[in-house]
């Protein structure tokens, strides 16, 4: 089978290897689609946490179960699925508290063990989620990032009638905007430096999309008081965006940290936090939102066409990574079609 391997920082190679055998309790999945997200790009550049080289990247995927090792999950053979990247021990204090992303022995598909940038992948059966026939496999590769967005919105407690601003209109940012609406909130503005991504946000009905330059969102809230958000969801990971979020949110408001960049330090003015009595909360991973993400994608309540901007065959991995890294050609998200 073909498999893309990150051998070392900034060194990727397309390899040919045997189809892997699933271990007991695991399934073998034929991958259909896999999208490239910001964490994959950071991993490629060598600035990511808890990752191991060499490894096959990829954790935003969809595919079909072709084999299962053991009785558990045998009914899934021949069905279309997606899956959680988190491979936790299940026994530590964090796992028993149902916070597996904090597992003391955390493994992650596409980072510490081979992921979905390959024609086949093995995965624990318990990580799989079955897809309805009404959800195309192309759209389904966005179930995982949509679950991340839903989890973040819920961790911040966004409720009906609240105003929300989103920092960053990449894949996660555009999904956050739609997740806010599912909870009855309204997105007053998106801040994003890439013009095509701002256009994508506007096409989703966001009323204002500012440049993403430092101070742009704050200036909007000064000139348009109705745009002052109750909640700011920071999805870009850029250090300056954290300070901007603190300044833009209303007194008594909430700031959610969703995006992050390893090795970069945000310089903040703590008086904004204290004087405005702000709540800052982080969110990581899909939590328990996979099933809902599948449901709303299948129903059409969330659209991902604007996210999946550039399709590539796995053979064209170098161009896929280059376009994504440079945000070239109006790129929002590169993805691999492994059925091609």
From Swiss-Prot:
Residues the record lists as binding Zn(2+) 1: 37, 59, 144
Keyword Signal: no
Root EC class: oxidoreductase
Pfam name, any one: ADH_N
Binding site residues for Zn(2+) 2: 89, 92, 95, 103
Catalytic activity: 2-deoxy-scyllo-inosamine + NADP(+) = 3-amino-2,3-dideoxy-scyllo-inosose + NADPH + H(+); 2-deoxy-scyllo-inosamine + NAD(+) = 3-amino-2,3-dideoxy-scyllo-inosose + NADH + H(+)
Function recorded in the entry: Catalyzes the oxidation of 2-deoxy-scyllo-inosamine (DOIA) with NAD(+) or NADP(+), forming 3-amino-2,3-dideoxy-scyllo-inosose (amino-DOI).
Protein's recorded name: 2-deoxy-scyllo-inosamine dehydrogenase
Taxonomic source organism: Streptomyces ribosidificus
Gene: rbmC
């Amino acid at each position: 089978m073909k498999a893309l391997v990150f051998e070392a920082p900034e060194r990727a190679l397309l390899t040919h290897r045997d189809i892997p055998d699933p271990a007991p309790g695991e399934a073998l999945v034929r991958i259909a689609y896999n999208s490239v997200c910001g964490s994959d790009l950071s991993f490629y550049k060598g600035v990511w946490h808890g990752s191991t080289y060499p490894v096959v990247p990829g954790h935003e995927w969809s595919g079909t179960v072709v084999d299962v090792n053991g009785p558990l999950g045998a009914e899934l053979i021949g069905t279309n699925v997606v899956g959680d990247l988190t491979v936790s021990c299940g026994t530590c204090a964090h796992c028993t508290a149902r916070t597996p992303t904090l597992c003391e022995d955390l493994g992650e598909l596409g980072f510490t063990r081979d992921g979905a940038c390959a024609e086949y992948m093995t995965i624990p059966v318990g990580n799989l989620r079955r897809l309805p026939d009404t959800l195309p496999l192309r759209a389904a590769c966005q179930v995982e990032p949509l679950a991340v967005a839903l989890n973040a919105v819920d961790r911040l407690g966004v409720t009906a009638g609240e105003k929300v601003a989103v920092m960053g209109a990449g894949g996660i940012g555009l999904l956050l905007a739609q997740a806010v609406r599912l909870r009855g909130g309204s997105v007053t503005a998106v801040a994003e430096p890439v013009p095509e991504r701002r256009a994508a946000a506007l096409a989703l009905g966001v009323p204002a999309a500012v440049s993403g330059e430092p101070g742009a969102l704050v200036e909007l809230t000064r000139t348009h008081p109705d745009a002052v958000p109750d909640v700011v969801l920071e999805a870009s990971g850029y250090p300056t965006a954290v300070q901007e979020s603190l300044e833009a949110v209303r007194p008594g408001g909430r700031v959610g940290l969703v995006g992050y960049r390893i090795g970069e330090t945000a310089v903040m003015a703590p008086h904004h936090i204290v004087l405005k009595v702000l709540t800052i909360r982080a969110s990581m991973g899909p939590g328990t939102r996979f099933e809902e993400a599948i449901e709303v994608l299948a129903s059409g309540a969330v659209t991902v066409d604007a996210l999946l901007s550039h399709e590539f065959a796995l053979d064209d991995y170098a161009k896929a990574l280059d376009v994504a890294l440079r945000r070239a050609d109006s790129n929002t998200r590169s993805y691999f079609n492994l059925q091609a």
